[in-house]
Amino acid sequence: MPELPEVETVRRGLESVVTDAKIVSVQLNRRDLRFPFPEAFSERLIGRKILELGRRAKYLLFHLSQDETILSHLGMSGSWRIENDLLRTAFSMTSKLVKHDHFIMDIQTRNGDVYHLIYNDVRRFGFMLLVDTDKLYKHPLLNKLGLEPMSHGFSGRYLQKAFVNKKVSLKGVLLDQSIVAGLGNIYVCEALWRSRLSPQRGAFTLASKTVYARELANSLAQNIRNVISEAILSGGSSLRDYMHVDGSLGYFQHAFSVYGREGKECLQCGTPIIRILQSGRSSFYCSQCQK
């Protein structure tokens, strides 16, 4: 599933084209994705402008004229891409993939160019909702989200407060979107390895008032920030279906230290990387370095 860096990369790729563009036509190739498309979705979009493209956690936010916002989630395999009559991505030439183009929105930019904004989703686990902009952050999908790793208030102190009395694992708490919004399995594994913390360690152990616990929490917060920042600069991680809006791939997966490296040597100490299951998800870590 695309995590914060992948969604932010998509946002940046779309932003320069879609901002202030007018929606001139909408084509729905099916009635639903994970959820049904909003009622009269096409009719409600045509003629509006996309004022701004935002993001909250793993959600893309197309802020429209007339005070509504398209809330888009990529699910497991969703992707957005941009094409026009002169530009065709390598992706668009593959008919096997194009058959999963479920939503096509033609937009006209400020200088009169027309682009096709296309949503493709093989597994159809993504979705789009139309929400009143003034009620957007009260929506159930957004109103309980925690701080994002790159936000001003995200710190070791914030994590320590969040970890108080948490008997569950560090991995489990960090994946809780009400605590850290946008963080997912890949980047939690990477940040924990950099912090020398086991994914199985109880989160509460970093919540004490000792200098040692405070240092661990500060290190973890900084490493989460670093991993997310580096992943964004690398265009995210392309493992299965994720790609950029031009059809190209992210390359942060080539910098993984632990994720997907089961049995390979730890880059720090040479001990084989272990894979375990936690709540049905794979965790990769070094039993020697991470305690």
Curated annotation (Swiss-Prot):
A zinc finger (FPG-type) spans 257-291. The keyword Hydrolase applies. Its EC number is 3.2.2.23, 4.2.99.18. GO terms for molecular function: 8-oxo-7,8-dihydroguanine DNA N-glycosylase activity; class I DNA-(apurinic or apyrimidinic site) endonuclease activity; damaged DNA binding; zinc ion binding. Binds 1 zinc ion per subunit. It catalyses: Hydrolysis of DNA containing ring-opened 7-methylguanine residues, releasing 2,6-diamino-4-hydroxy-5-(N-methyl)formamidopyrimidine; 2'-deoxyribonucleotide-(2'-deoxyribose 5'-phosphate)-2'-deoxyribonucleotide-DNA = a 3'-end 2'-deoxyribonucleotide-(2,3-dehydro-2,3-deoxyribose 5'-phosphate)-DNA + a 5'-end 5'-phospho-2'-deoxyribonucleoside-DNA + H(+). It holds the Pfam family H2TH. The active site is at residues 2-3, 58, 281. PANTHER family: FORMAMIDOPYRIMIDINE-DNA GLYCOSYLASE (PTHR22993:SF9). Belongs to the FPG family. This is Formamidopyrimidine-DNA glycosylase. The lineage of its organism: Bacteria, Pseudomonadati, Pseudomonadota, Alphaproteobacteria, Hyphomicrobiales. The gene is mutM.
